[in-house]
Amino acid sequence: MDLYCSFIRISNHVKMSTFILLTLCFYVALSDRSPEYALTKVTEAEDDGNVEAIVENEPDPEDQEIFYPTREWQVVKPGQAVPAGLHMRLNLQTGKNEAKLLEEKEGKDRPKQKRKSSTTSDKYTKKELKEALTKFKEGAEQLSPAEEKDYLQDIKQRFRPIEDLQKAFNDLNINVETDFEIMTKIVNRFNSSSSTTEKVSALYDLEYYVHQVDNAQNLLKLGALQLLINSLNSTDTLLIENSAFVIGSALSSNPKVQIEAFEAGALQKLLVILAADQEVSVKKKTLYALSSMLRQFPYAQQRFMKLGGLQILKNFFKEKNAESLYIRVITLLYDMIMEKMLLYKENNTEQYEQKYQQYNQINLLESITEQGWCPIISDLLRLPENDSREKVLKAVLTLIPLCRAEFLKDCNLLTLLNSLRKEYEGLAAEELRSGEQDGYFSEILSLTISITDKLK
């Protein structure tokens, strides 16, 4: 009986042990399947009640959804696959896991190691490079005429001629239009339309193309330049404004088109618009066209002076709400003055004699002083924009030889120069502290000092 009881007790112990063992196995298997118990490498940190950690998760190919991190904290949904190396925290207020990308200071060591390991394999010594070049040359020299012929034939087979490609496009009903063909369609659209809106739209499209020298000269072949010049006579301000805009873009740094436009009477029409009572937006585009015609074109500058162009520009300073035109006018006059000065310094260019004679007939500086431009220009130093001040300072410095007496009479000018000097001394000092040598503000300060010294 005692033996039987002992057997029963032993059997119960075995059953209990077996049950405990099976329970532990089931628990381990369950925790291994759950992402919440996945092995992680955690660095704990405290941050105002939030528990933060840097986590590197093992990738799980069975995950249905991937977490895409940003620089901001985002909630990590249950079951999402989280990339390695993110900043993780448990938000104690919401009870949810959040993650974001590491800051640069936290993750900068790891990228450095990667860059170091990735670049070492790409380094070659000078000796290795020389040997590679020598072998390359030797290999090229060893090609026989037959091998070279085969090589060229292989190249031809790989790449198709442009004619074949165009034929293929034509077979597919795909027409690759040239700029000339596109411009032809635009001009036809402008010419055939009676709607101002459609005409302005065509001019807008045309202006995009005429910036290129060849396309601008295509206007001559199409007869479109004369069409644009005739549009300057329109009573529609939108048509005038956009026509002048296209003309200005076409004339810019394009001598051939400049000459054609001049001979077609564009200069006179532009001056008429600028002298009339027009909106500032119209005058701005017209002044752009005038500037494009006059630059590097001394014969047009002569005609401009004879037609009273300088006086027309001076009248802008009497108009209301025309401040946006002031600096454009001063910039144009300064450029015209500098063209003549630079020509005298560079007397070794071709056609120098012809240009010298043409520029010598332009008395722009004398006309500026005679027509009372000196105080008008110096007064523009009151403008707040640094770019405007720089352009005015350059003009004032250039005009000192002829405007010196009037500048000295203007007590406000000297006070203004001293104020500008103090302002730009501070700005230039900040540039130097930031390690910038010969910066923008230092240049403006230098101009201010030069003018002040020359007026003493």
UniProtKB/Swiss-Prot annotation:
Glycosylated sites: 191, 233, 347, 386
Keyword vocabulary terms for this entry: Endoplasmic reticulum, Glycoprotein, Protein transport, Signal, Translocation, Transport
Gene Ontology molecular functions: adenyl-nucleotide exchange factor activity
Signal peptide: 1-31
Gene Ontology terms describing biological process: protein transport
UniProt region (Disordered), positions on chain: 102-124
UniProt xrefs under Gene3D superfamilies: Leucine-rich Repeat Variant
Subcellular location: Endoplasmic reticulum lumen
Superkingdom as given in the UniProt entry: Eukaryota
Main location: endoplasmic reticulum
Cellular component GO terms, alphabetical: endoplasmic reticulum; endoplasmic reticulum lumen
Stored PANTHER family: NUCLEOTIDE EXCHANGE FACTOR SIL1, PROTEIN FOLDING REGULATOR
Function according to Swiss-Prot or TrEMBL: Required for protein translocation and folding in the endoplasmic reticulum (ER). Functions as a nucleotide exchange factor for the ER lumenal chaperone HSPA5.
Protein name: Nucleotide exchange factor SIL1
Species the sequence originates in: Xenopus laevis
